[in-house]
């Protein structure tokens, strides 16, 4: 599917051909995504590459989803080929598209394929194109014996001993039947039909005709079909998003409306003449060790960092694999199916879920709640519409409220997700860990105490997706208990850490008795001051853990504490609803009625509507535990989404929740990327309340501009010094390339003046740029509420707007900044002034003396800035090999970047720091940007005075060129008016391994990234030793690193 169009064949209506073309177009995205999977996960030789022109890179979610689809189909074929039989075997792929599955199996499982012949079947014109691609590919034809390429008019396009390609519309079953019986199939053989998301594009009557025909073609046939279904109805947010996507493409799904459930699909096949049919969701198959082994699941995480578990489960729960057979026994063993849904005891009628107003904004996932007052709450950081958001949304029930009662986290707390915030007495709270990317976990912790935020003792190791709960020890001191989580290198923790308000940092808690397996994303909550429950989470084998523990923290006479854990899984399984409590990414909130469990994902199936919210009766639980009696059915009840859902169904993943009243729960945020179909956001605040309550949902979002947090002072933050004298960067003229090469060799910044950079210095006025670029051209700009943009704090927004509007606003004093990105492929290609702004390319040039820059150019972004300062950072970038880039380190390399900054219009002031100063500039591990705002006061030009540093200053006028050597940290500030400039980044040093593609020039060398992971492993090697001994040896190792760095 996915061929270029040809004139309509005789007898085929124009409408029918258009519909066929739309169906074939669905193959384009699919085959590209499979190529992405092949690049990362499959050993060579690769075969998708011959059908996909450009080497793609899909997101980890798309990669894992397609990996599972590909594995499901390939594993089904392997199981068929492994079945003992004296008959010849045939694998008929109905609607094969450009999928090269036969060639992959012939290459990797040659002996297994010895008695099997593969037959690809699809539209005539698609198979003509597939034939052309195969004919010109020696790597494929060498796998085939006695291969023949027949004419385009022939029903058989390719014939060989192992493989045939047939062009035939599946609605023309007579033609297909004749070809197979006369040209291919012997009277006695075994057949496996494959249909991977192909029959569902046919009308139901035609698709069912294919199934009935296939069941009668041979008395030893099996059918393997992979398609979408509705595990929880078409109104589920993922399902509705998926259907809108396919309808928008003009290729709607048909069978899914007629056969919504797995049981209906199984009955469909039995009605079509198949003796046996078994359907299972891909999420169910993912957890089956016979289908996807635990070691294989664990290996996937070593290929690329992955943390899109909720979205992966949603996708896999909406696709099924069905295997049917003409014989009573199927080719796969009969496995235990998911039990039928039971919701008893059902208390949904006792609750109501109230939807709030849907304001513009407030869209964030995987954030954390910040306590404020009885009538207000903050939703901090998390993942916004485009990136992680450093801000905190203020929700309030008071109409006149504009600012929080207590301070929200300052911008020094870098944007993060999957972190925790635990409420303490008097409005205090503790923020712990989190992550940027899954490979960049945070170790820092922040305490709000006495209405002020301050950095507190960091975690022993970075972690995210951990669980945290407040406990009160016998000394009446408040503490925070943290369990589990995941680190940057993929390690999963089973440790319990204790933070106490009056102690120095974190201590690992000793465990007595059984120890729960390591996990992340678990459900942890207290049921009194020192006792609580633990359940769910994902373990090291990539599946949700189905257990239930009760923990109790105890004191010894010497003041130390230990944790006592008891496994009550068997007791819980006596209750009818136990299968729905084992969750990942759920919230657990303590209320007067018990623990309210909201959303998340569960093993093997989607969370059904009736069990989205559940109630664990704490009183019943404690009674059963104390009396050691059997657990009754009342301990766990289903609330669902209440008796009557008011509003559209929310998607309860990535959300946050808290008790706002003894028996009311507030739910904020959430949503998910619904695979490749679009993003669904749960907006506004939702309130779960008892049905008899008269309370209303008055929670609304307060506009962010009213409560933007100010930075707080920290003992480590440098203070402003207006008396600081900066050394000026020298100005020189450069007339020859030899002179510039000497500048490179010196490795010091210089301002090159008197060079000809083209007529841009005169032409690029506001009016000229608007006319040439186009007033309506869409650009993405940084829009800031502050005059100091901070990349770590993400105190700005990415806003898409018309270029003309941007110029109007920035010339009117708007705090905006444009750093152009690739117009064609912004996520894959670096900015290129000539390609992105062709109308400007003849206006700008580099002088001949800088030919080395032109010859080694990486990117050339256009920069237009108003009265706003840039963050302090350094530049380093990765690039791609010609044959296509891969995630594996050995296949990619980085280039340390130098750059020349060409000032076109206006004036710009820059401050630069030499590489050796980086240790004093508060650049977080793994980052290339500092947290310090160098320009603390734009009006008087003062900058921070930082001990042990040697800042240098450059003031650029129109026509000046600033050479910035590699690793020199730099920041820029306007000196009045609008600044227009062009950067040209170029490769100035030998190759070094990279951490990945970076079109913006801000990613570090792989050697550094790898070393950071090694440091984390080094720290963990001292686990179990007394803290003073661990500290002693870590300090010795730190000194060795300093010695090697020459410090």
Curated annotation (Swiss-Prot):
Annotated protein name in UniProt: tRNA wybutosine-synthesizing protein 4
GO terms of biological process kind: tRNA methylation; wybutosine biosynthetic process
Pfam family name, one: Kelch_4
EC code(s) of this entry: 2.1.1.290, 2.3.1.231
Matching Gene3D superfamilies: 6.10.140.1470, Cupin, Kelch-type beta propeller, Vaccinia Virus protein VP39
Source organism phylogeny: Eukaryota, Fungi, Dikarya, Ascomycota, Pezizomycotina
Domain JmjC, first and last residues per copy: 814-1003
PANTHER family documented for this protein: TRNA WYBUTOSINE-SYNTHESIZING PROTEIN 4 (PTHR46529:SF1)
Keyword GTP-binding found: no
Job of this protein: Probable S-adenosyl-L-methionine-dependent methyltransferase that acts as a component of the wybutosine biosynthesis pathway. Wybutosine is a hyper modified guanosine with a tricyclic base found at the 3'-position adjacent to the anticodon of eukaryotic phenylalanine tRNA. May methylate the carboxyl group of leucine residues to form alpha-leucine ester residues.
Organism in which the protein naturally occurs: Aspergillus fumigatus (strain ATCC MYA-4609 / CBS 101355 / FGSC A1100 / Af293) (Neosartorya fumigata)
InterPro entries attached to this UniProt entry: Cupin_8, Gal_Oxase/kelch_b-propeller, JmjC_dom, Kelch-typ_b-propeller, Ppm1/Ppm2/Tcmp, SAM-dependent_MTases_sf
